[in-house]
Structure formats: C-alpha cells, structure tokens
C-alpha cells in the first residue's frame, strides 16, 4: 500500500527515528564517496508551482545520488496549467513515475493529488505545512543533541508553514515548541489544537523574550513569503521587535543553537551577526535537506534501506 508524506504526522515516532538514522547513514556514504544507488531505475516527478532553490536542487541531486532520475515539471508547461483537473494529472503521472513531489500554494491541492495518485506523494511545501524542512531540521538537531526529548525550541516571528510543521512534530520528538508571534501572524488555531491533541507540548505567546527563555534552539523564517508581497509593509511593521539578534539570543540557554530554513532577509528576521555567529547551524540544516529527503524517498519508494541493502 502506498504511503504519502504530506504532514510530519504521516509518520510515527519510530518511523521518524528510522528515517533520521538512514539519513545519517546516507550522509556518511556520500561523504565517503561510496555508491548508494538504492533507487536505481526509479523516477521522481517534481511539480513546482512556487520557485525553489533548496527543494529542487536537493531532490534532483538526491535522486541522482540514489541511482534514479528526477523530472522537473512546471505546471505552466503541463495541461494542469491549462485547466486539466488535478485528479486526471495525478492518475496519469502515477503511470509514469514512482513518486511525485509537489511544491504548491494550496495544501488542499496536494491532498487531492495524493488521493488520486497510486504512487507516494511528497509535500515539498504548501501554504499550510513544510514537513520536508522539519524532517531535515530534526536530523540536524539529532546530530547535535542525540535524544531530543525535553529540549525546547522557540519559534520567533511569522507563524507560517514551517512553524506549523514544527508544532505538529512536538508529539513525535518530545520537544517543547514555544512560538512568539504578533496576534495576526500567530500559527493557525487548528494546527495548535491538532498538535496538542496528538500529545505535543506547545505554547503560543506574543512576547519573544518569554518564548526564548531557557530555549535550546531559536528558529525563524522570512517575514514575507512568496504570495504575501502585497502585505510587505504591513508585515514588517507588525513583526518589528521579533528579530533574532544578539540581545534576544542572550535570553536563551547559553549554548542555544540558531536555525533558519532560508532564504534569509538579514536585518529583518535575523541579524547578520547571529546568522554568521558560532551558534548558527543554518548551513548544516540546509545540507541536511539532501540527506533527509533521500532517506524519505528510499522509505516511500523502496520500503527503507533495510529492504534494499
């Protein structure tokens, strides 16, 4: 039976640990220059409604590393961009490729695609969630801390799709997630409720100092995402005071780490000093998109590394 990855909660705690372990192993194999073509002869279709750097490159390189092939599909070059229904496109593509990754404006569209495709569908980003990013982030923190249970992550700024996925992950990792956002840009209530119902420990406040107190990890993202450009001035005004700078970082645990999923607008959500500082692990998490997604694809397409060793 095919398995999709539309939300971090589509996998359980044990499966998350297994994927992270596989990702670490794949990272070592790549570093050593050892072939690891666990998906030889397999194809991944990639549909991008939104522009991308990290998502496209990491999935394309990942499939190449694994011995497979990634096919880039722009909706404007497909019948999907000319009015073909999602369900029809999903059924046809599933006859050609072994999995589909979609980066779209609408989470509902990805869910509909997954309902009609009989191959695994991966959410490469939607307006609601970004589970691939959080999977890579969890791998990155696991490399630093080992067991994540009891750690506190403070999200500062716009309660966006990455923030939503972090809230949902709390039930799987045992981490406490504290969010500081202005009222208008707080995470969705239904996501907060879902995270708590799943067993997550989450809090949402308006004061950044309160959220970061004793935090082991500080996390932020750009304040103006693709599609929100018309709100730029309003967002910058509302989020003033939510910048991760050296003063805010000092309120966290002494050895707190700083994360940002990129792209960054330095001087807005994060200062250059913090971004380039010794507590920043931004580049590690960016690299780990590659390894975590490779492990995910092996799991979804081939059943995991244990199945293909």
Swiss-Prot record:
Pfam families xref list: OTCace, OTCace_N
Species, as recorded: Methanoculleus marisnigri (strain ATCC 35101 / DSM 1498 / JR1)
Domain of life: Archaea
UniProt record similarity statement: Belongs to the aspartate/ornithine carbamoyltransferase superfamily. OTCase family.
Stated role: Reversibly catalyzes the transfer of the carbamoyl group from carbamoyl phosphate (CP) to the N(epsilon) atom of ornithine (ORN) to produce L-citrulline.
Gene encoding the protein: argF
Catalytic reactions on record: carbamoyl phosphate + L-ornithine = L-citrulline + phosphate + H(+)
Keyword terms of this UniProt record: Amino-acid biosynthesis, Arginine biosynthesis, Cytoplasm, Transferase
An example Gene Ontology biological process: L-arginine biosynthetic process
Enzymatic class: transferase
Compartment(s): Cytoplasm
Residues given in the record as L-ornithine binding sites: 161, 221, 225-226
Entry keyword Cell membrane: no
InterPro entries in the cross-refs: Asp/Orn_carbamoyltranf_P-bd, Asp/Orn_carbamoylTrfase, Asp/Orn_carbamoylTrfase_sf, Asp_carbamoyltransf_Asp/Orn-bd, Orn/put_carbamltrans, OTCase_ArgI
Gene Ontology molecular functions: amino acid binding; ornithine carbamoyltransferase activity
Residues given in the record as carbamoyl phosphate binding sites: 52-55, 79, 103, 130-133, 261-262, 289
EC number: 2.1.3.3
Name of the protein in question: Ornithine carbamoyltransferase
